[in-house]
């Protein structure tokens, strides 16, 4: 029999590689690990990579296995979902993986300047109604700048044509360097080990015949960031665990 939510929450609270700081607690509880992830937790100087909106955490666990010379931190607010990856990494003794349960809106409170090298955004909610909630919006780019190294790498992997198109326009509007871009990752010319990692939800979308889009771009520290002023056609389908789209056909 699988564990219920309360049992999963109890496990999460006991795991040494899980840090739980929901929005309601952050103002009252100082986060001592900020600026000390390398020294105090990972105990090495390997690059730190974040996965924001990690869901079950399978992608972080997969990356951790694939790249033992990097440190990975999976971030999400849903503790019961994160339990899957947190439990697997704990039981297998992985030392280069951690989990942070918090709201991504306050992610800059947990890392010091230049402490993070890369960010993965895997199947983020496209937030078609409000640009500032999109994890590739300039609102979030400014937050990432507070802790990402200059020209740090950002990976977007998505089934959403809306999210992919919006991110392309955001990149173009701000002249951000693009290292790779494709509208169909598994039929592209990209040769990379990351192709071997598929999350539970990603496989569902592939089974439904949806193509997976991918962008790898850099975020310089300098330069004012501007939001793209363009209407984008909304996704015509309802992705797993996303709220139903509105009656609108386009959005900025």
From Swiss-Prot:
Reactions it catalyzes: guanosine(46) in tRNA + S-adenosyl-L-methionine = N(7)-methylguanosine(46) in tRNA + S-adenosyl-L-homocysteine
Catalytic site positions: 125
Keywords for this protein: Methyltransferase, S-adenosyl-L-methionine, Transferase, tRNA processing
EC number annotated for this UniProt entry: 2.1.1.33
Pathway(s) per entry: tRNA modification; N(7)-methylguanine-tRNA biosynthesis
Classification via Gene3D superfamilies: Vaccinia Virus protein VP39
Binding locations of S-adenosyl-L-methionine: 51, 76, 103, 125
Cellular component terms (Gene Ontology): tRNA methyltransferase complex
InterPro entries assigned to the protein according to its UniProt record, in alphabetical order: SAM-dependent_MTases_sf (IPR029063), tRNA_(Gua-N-7)_MeTrfase_Trmb (IPR003358), tRNA_methyltr_TrmB_bact (IPR055361)
Superkingdom, taxonomy of origin: Bacteria
Binding site for substrate: 129, 159, 199-202
GO MF entry, a single one: tRNA (guanine(46)-N7)-methyltransferase activity
Family: Belongs to the class I-like SAM-binding methyltransferase superfamily. TrmB family.
Function text: Catalyzes the formation of N(7)-methylguanine at position 46 (m7G46) in tRNA.
Protein name listed in UniProt: tRNA (guanine-N(7)-)-methyltransferase
Species name: Bacteroides fragilis (strain ATCC 25285 / DSM 2151 / CCUG 4856 / JCM 11019 / LMG 10263 / NCTC 9343 / Onslow / VPI 2553 / EN-2)
């Amino acid at each position: 029999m699988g564990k219920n939510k309360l049992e999963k929450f109890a496990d999460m609270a006991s795991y040494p590689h899980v840090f739980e700081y929901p929005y309601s607690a952050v103002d009252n509880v100082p986060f001592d690990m900020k600026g000390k992830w390398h020294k105090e937790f990972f105990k090495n100087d390997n690059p730190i990579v974040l996965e924001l909106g990690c869901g079950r955490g399978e992608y972080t666990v997969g990356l951790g296995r694939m790249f033992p010379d990097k440190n990975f931190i999976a971030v999400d607010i849903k503790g019961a979902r994160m339990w899957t990856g947190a439990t697997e990494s704990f039981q297998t003794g992985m030392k280069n993986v951690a989990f942070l349960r918090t709201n991504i809106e306050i992610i800059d409170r947990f890392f010091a300047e230049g402490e993070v090298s890369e960010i993965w955004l895997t199947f983020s909610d496209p937030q078609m109604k409000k640009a500032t909630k999109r994890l590739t919006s300039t609102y979030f780019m400014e937050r990432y700048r507070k802790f990402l190294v200059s020209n740090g790498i950002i990976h977007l992997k998505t089934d959403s044509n809306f999210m992919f198109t919006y991110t392309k326009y955001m990149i173009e509007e701000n002249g951000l360097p693009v290292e790779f871009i494709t509208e169909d990752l598994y039929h592209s010319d990209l040769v990379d080990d990351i192709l071997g990692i598929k999350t539970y939800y990603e496989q569902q979308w592939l089974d439904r015949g949806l193509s997976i889009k991918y962008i790898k771009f850099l975020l310089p520290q300098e330069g004012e960031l501007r939001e793209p002023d363009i209407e984008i056609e909304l996704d015509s389908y309802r992705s797993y665990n996303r709220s139903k789209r509105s009656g609108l056909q386009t959005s900025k």
